[in-house]
Amino acid sequence: MTIKLTSKDDEKRAKIFKALSEVKRIEMIRYLVRHPEHKTCGEVGESLGMDKSNVSYHLKILYEAELIHIYRRGQNKYGQLREDTFNAFLPGFLDSL
């Protein structure tokens, strides 16, 4: 596996590294890796002992870095990993969690 090395992706790389610079966000990614079945954003936060506003804040940053996809089903929001982003920019990272 190779990591993309074009300069046009530098801004995206910076967003990814900034998003992963917070321990809580890494814990959220780890939770989604270990629980691949679809989990609501509330379930993610509850399992990590986070209140709703903190969960929303951290998920937004992960979403903006294209590390997760957030979708709505009914009244619930769900978080799902964007494995394509991890494979392109951080190959092997998800396996290390």
Residues covered by each model-derived region:
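N-terminal leader segment of winged-helix/HTH proteins
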Residues: M1-L20, A65, L81, A88-F93
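N-terminal helix-turn-helix DNA-binding core of bacterial DNA-binding proteins
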Residues: K12-D51, R73-D84
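Alpha-helical residues within the helix-turn-helix
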Residues: E46, Y57, Y63-E64
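Short coil turns linking two alpha-helices in DNA-binding domains
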Residues: D51, S56-H58
